[in-house]
Each structure stands twice: as C-alpha cells, then as structure tokens.
Amino acid sequence: MRDFMDYIQLAFYDASKWNRDNSYSQLTTTANALLDFSTPERLKVNLSSLSTPHFATTYTLGTVGLIDGSISYLFTTIPLHDTPSRSTLIPLRKLVPGYRQIYPPSLPPAFPAADGRDGDLAIGGTEGDLKKKATLLHATLHLPPPTTLTGSFLRRLSPTTQLSLAFCSSRAPASKSAPQATLVTQILYDTGKYNSEFLFSTDNALFGFKGLWNFGPDPRKQNQNGGDPAREPCRSLLSLLSAGGEVYYSPVSSVVGLSTGLRFTTLPAATENPHSTFPYTLTLTLTPLTGSMSTTYSLLASPNLAFSSRFGFNVYSWESEMVAGCELWRRSKKLHTLQRNSSPLFAVDDLTWARRKMGLQDAAVSVHSERDDLPGIQRYDHDMHHHTQRPHASDSVIKVRVDQSWNIRALWEGRVKELVVSAGIALGPKSRSSLSYASSLAASGPGAAGGLSSYGWKSVGVSVLYSS
C-alpha cells in the first residue's frame, strides 16, 4: 500500500499534467506492482491529513519489537481541490498499485510553439496564474535515533522539463561528527515521443542518464498539423513499442552501470470494443555487464483480475529466477447489487467480459447491445489512467506471489469502517542455526543431514491508515 504522501505526490503529478508513465524508470511498473509488492512486517499506524488544498501532514508509529515513527510534511503550489483525502473516500486503486494501462504518447500541456517559446500559462493554473511554476516540497523526519531526515523538491521548469531534488541525511546515535548527507539531482525532459533523464548524486559523484523512445507517430508533428491521429477511430493506435536504456558512471569509485529494455503493451483502442484482445504488457530488460536478462508478461484477465510472471537468467552463473503472481479485486455484495440495479453499465460481470474478449456469445446478456457495454469498458480504462473515483470502486484486493524457491507472499488490503487496513504474511524456507542442526543430527542420526532448512513463517504484519 502506498503511503499517504506518495498518494499526494501522485495527485500532484496528475494536477500538473506530468506523464509519469513515459519514463524508463517506469518500464516494468505493472510487473513490479504484481510481483514485488511488500507485506507489513509488524504493526504500523498512519495518521494523515490534507488540512488545506496546499498542505498535508502524516504521523507514523511502528511497534512490535522496535518502537519508531516519523513525521512528514508536504506543500504544493497547486491546489489539490479534487483530491479525496478522507480514508473512506480515497479510491482503493489509488493506494494499491496494480495493473496499469498505458496510453498513447501525447504532448505535455502548453507545449512550446513552433518558434520555440514556452507557453506562459502555468501548469494546472488559470489566466491569473501566469508564470507560476508547479512546485512541491516534502520532508520526513524518522525517529528515534539513528535520526534520519529525507526530503524532496519538485519544480516544473517548463511544460516539458521538470527538476527533482532528493536528499537524505542521517546521524548515528553516539556519533558527534557532522551528519552524513546525500543529494540526488534529476532533470527530466518529456516530449511525448521520447523522454530523457539526467542524474547526479553526491554519493561517489555518480552521473547517470536514462532515455525512453516510443515507436510510432510523433505527437509533436501531430500538434503542428492541428490534429491527433491517436484520437481518430480510423487511425487509432492499437499497441505501443518502447525502447530505452540507462547508464551510470562514478569517476571516484570507477563504477559503471548499464542496462537496456523493451516494452510492448496494448493500448485502450485495442481493448475498448467487446470482441478484442485482453490487455497485456510484455517487457525485456538486459544488463550486459552482469550478464542478466529478465522478461515479464502481465495480463488483465478481467477488470478485477490480473496475472503476471517473470523469468530471469544470468548467462555467467547460469542462475535463473521464476516468479508468478496475481491480484483479485473484490466488491461487497451490497455495493455490487446496488450498482447492477442502478445502471446497466455494471450488469456485465467479469466472466461475461472475458467471454466477449474471446469472441464467445453469452445468451444471458444478449439483451444488451455492444454500444451499451462499450462505454463501460472505455470508462474503466479511463479511470485506470486518470484515477478518478467511480461507483465501482473496489472494497478490497488480494495479492499473491510465489517464486521457484517457494517463497510465498500474500497480501490483503481493504476498508474496515473508516480505516484502510493492509495485512500480509510471508512464508518460505528458513535456514536452521548450527545448534538446532547439531541437535537434529544427534536425535535423528546421520541420515537427517539432508534437512538443512525448514519451511515456515517469515513475517506477519498489519498496517492501518486513517486520513482526514
């Protein structure tokens, strides 16, 4: 589950019209959300509030074994009037990342004119907000010692350029020396056709560059021609192929990093009609220096069910990795019955939706025309992209993932009264201590030497969020 501050930061991106999907850093977002989700390891309580449209606070307290906490503050120059802040109103899909629908590349708002001048209108603003830059400030203080202070600064320099500063400062409990600090600076440039990121970190003077290129029509040329072919039915894009890479170099430690990747995904135009393909995303990433490669395949089997798998292989060590996971969104029977009775839009269930994707007829819903069902699919895809609250907001979600070593993680997230609760468990093989191993040999004899590990619980935890 995302932290409340991460949720507010995503709302800032939406309000400033910044496309966070068009980035090499987000190449495997869908697979990571379905396969690499974390489970709570103890009891954690979060109290948050969006006290004004510009200011948010969060207080966190963790317990069980170690008591710690944090205090966070966030300020943005863009008013977040349309952002739900109460825990009972926040759509659960905003707090729980899952399968993410990618949309065709588009121009940032107020894109520079043909003569190269930037638009004067502020991002997300009105005529009275001329020359006002979208800015976000965020700081978090982690207590008790070792005290750590983290923060970030975001500023929209132009419709296509964004500046990001992130710092981390920590100090050991008994140390009298100056706190150690690290500053990471990023400049992001997005034209819709391609995205580039320049990075510098004070830790070992690390320099980095990331880039992503989208194959297909150029949104900049479409803007100059006064049209957008992606919006025309006869020329709608059905899929998107993106290629990118990243490179890092540190002159201090002589460290070099390099990776490249591909992503192929279906677009809404390929899945918005009843007889079409299932939405899916394929990725391939390569790290030549370490000899690692990884492929992922994610499928949206229904509006409430998604599957994902990943296979990794190292050509130097011949080690491999296999991971599979899924997520299932659920709605309460009372809410589901109310939706079915209020509008025919929700009369088509997940099984019927899947049947139509496979081209199978269902007599039970033949009374509804394709035109009646089409807005439902379009509206669903639109909501997945813009994260707007709709009556079909889910009540809970179950996530499960397992790898080739039978490490299993299960997560349930949902609402309990006015709280958003996240509960998870982790199971897997555990190495025995030398003492327990010696005792097992003495009790069972040499024949028990094969039992070097046992299987059991790794962690169990609960996280609770309340916001106002």
UniProtKB/Swiss-Prot annotation:
GO CC annotation terms, alphabetical: ERMES complex; SAM complex
UniProt organism field: Blastomyces gilchristii (strain SLH14081)
Protein family membership: Belongs to the MDM10 family.
Localization (cell): Mitochondrion outer membrane
Pfam families: MDM10
Gene name, Swiss-Prot/TrEMBL: MDM10
Domain of life: Eukaryota
Subunit structure: Component of the ER-mitochondria encounter structure (ERMES) or MDM complex, composed of MMM1, MDM10, MDM12 and MDM34. Associates with the mitochondrial outer membrane sorting assembly machinery SAM(core) complex.
Protein name (database record): Mitochondrial distribution and morphology protein 10
Mitochondrion is among the record's keywords: yes
Domain remarks: Lacks alpha-helical transmembrane segments, suggesting that it resides in the membrane via beta-sheet conformations similar to those predicted for other outer membrane proteins and porin.
